[in-house]
Structures are given as C-alpha cells and as structure tokens.
Amino acid sequence: MTTALDQLKQYTTVVADTGDFQQLAQYKPQDATTNPSLILKAVQKDDYKPLLEKTVKAHASKPVGAIIDQLLIAFGTEILKIIPGRVSTEVDARLSFDTEGSIAKGRELIALYKEHGIGRERVLIKLASTWEGIRAAEVLQKEGIHCNMTLLFSLAQAAACAEAGAQLISPFVGRIYDWYKKNAGSAWDEAKDGGANDPGVKSVRRIYAYYKKFGYKTEVMGASFRTPGQILELAGCDLLTISPDLLQKLHESTEKVERKLSPDIAKESDIERVPVDESSFRFLVNDEAMATEKLAEGIRAFAADAIKLEKLIDALR
C-alpha cells in the first residue's frame, strides 16, 4: 500500500520542520525549515554537540550574536547536503519590530551562506509577519533575497505579505487550534470543531483561496501542526512543513489521501480583498485577539530561545 506521506507528495511539496538533520533523509522532503527553538533543541542532543563545539571554537573571538549566525549557517549547510531544495533560516526574533535591523541581518545571513558556497536561491530568510518584518521582506525580495514570513495567524498578515512580494508565507495551524481550543474550554467538541472545521485549517484554506483568487505568486506553506489529520485536511496546499514525528506517522499510515485544496476551486471563492496600508493592517491584526496574542507569544518564545542559545554558547567559550 502507498503511504499517506507518498500520497500527500502527489498534491503538495513536503517540507521537514526540524534542526535535527540526521532525521531528514528517510522522509525525502524537498525543503526544510528551522527556527531558534528547533536549533536550540538540536544542539542539546549529543549528536550535534560536535557541530556546536566546532562552530563556537572556530568563532570564539566574535560576539555571541555572530556565533549564533555561524551556527545557523552550519545547520543550514548540513541540511542542504541532504535535501534538493531550500532551507529556511530565521532572523533573530528580537528584530521583529526593526525593519532596518531585519534587512541587515537578512543580508548578513545570505552573505554567510555565500561564503559556504551556497547560492541565495537555496535559502529562505524567515521574518516575523509584523508590519516591520513585512517591510523588510519587501526590500530583501527586490534584492533577490527570498523571504519566508513566519508567525502568521491572520488574513491581514497574509494579504500584506503578498502585496510586499514575499516568496512564501507560513500560516500556523496548530497554534491557532491551540488558542481556540483553550478559549472554548469545556465547550470544545473535537468531533465538531476539529477536522475540516479546525480553526487553523480554516485559516490556511482562507488564505490559500485569497492568494489564488487574486493571482498572488507568494507560496502558501501550512506550518505548526498538531496531528496528521490537520495536515491531510490541507492536502493540495502549495507546501506543508511537518515535524519528524508527524512525518513518521504519515509514513506509517496507509490512509487514503484526497486533495482538499486546489487553485481552480479557490479561484471561485467569494473572499474579498483586504486593505494592506499600515493603519488598516495594525487595526485588523489588533482586532483579532487570537492573532494578536499568538504573534506576541511567538515572538517572546523565539526571543527567549535565542537568549538560551546565547547562554549555551557563552558557557562553551
């Protein structure tokens, strides 16, 4: 029997969401995504301590931020030896409200990859989908530096990213699901509120329809999944980035996978254009409690993990 993972690959580009590159080869993903939390998790494993120690030793005289950049590039370089496509490398979350700082960091990361013989076409620079992050992406994209817009929880963010010409967006499914489930409390009914009615699934479906209806070239990559069911509800999305645990579950399953999203159906959507000027963007994101809370929470969490990584590196110097 064909696995659910192989069936999914007929409709969607499968991406591995991990810093643990030793797990990659068995699932044959096209691309891979990383973030500060995933890199922190990886370097705490014995398998990756030699890479961490080698990187810190080679750049010990540099500021800790520069060593983190070198570590991100080291992981990205190893990942690109395994996958045929692109790796996503994230800009420090503490720059989420700093357009110029984000632009500078994006350029630095691409320059470091170039020093390792890796062209910009194989790298996506991950930026938070704040107003400032989106403006940074607009500049970087015009320079030929492709951007992956992360921490995306609303149609307003997605619309602004598309207008800015971002290469790709990563709308978060699981974190949206978490918020609605937590806020519903005892009223949550998984049978009724999950599956096709899952708030995270519905959010990505809506964004996908918006992009296809209005002809945007920006790629939609569903992210942050909790279950195989959430993934399969989005079969047909441009890309889906999936953790190794869930890739394994899909690999073990022979469940029949049907295409749920397609450009032709999406183009028939009655969805309307969203204003993307700064005041409208800020109001619309603020008006959606889930998006506001999860964006802020996500930035705090990624920033906290960057600080933990700094302390880990300082302890090795």
UniProtKB/Swiss-Prot annotation:
GO terms for molecular function: transaldolase activity. Its main location: cytoplasm. Pathway: Carbohydrate degradation; pentose phosphate pathway; D-glyceraldehyde 3-phosphate and beta-D-fructose 6-phosphate from D-ribose 5-phosphate and D-xylulose 5-phosphate (non-oxidative stage): step 2/3. Keywords: Cytoplasm, Pentose shunt, Schiff base, Transferase. The active site is at residue 126. It is found in: Cytoplasm. GO terms for cellular component: cytoplasm. Its EC number is 2.2.1.2. Pfam families: TAL_FSA (PF00923). CDD domains: Transaldolase_TalAB (cd00957). It catalyses: D-sedoheptulose 7-phosphate + D-glyceraldehyde 3-phosphate = D-erythrose 4-phosphate + beta-D-fructose 6-phosphate. The keyword Transferase applies. Belongs to the transaldolase family. Type 1 subfamily. Transaldolase is important for the balance of metabolites in the pentose-phosphate pathway. Homodimer. This is Transaldolase.
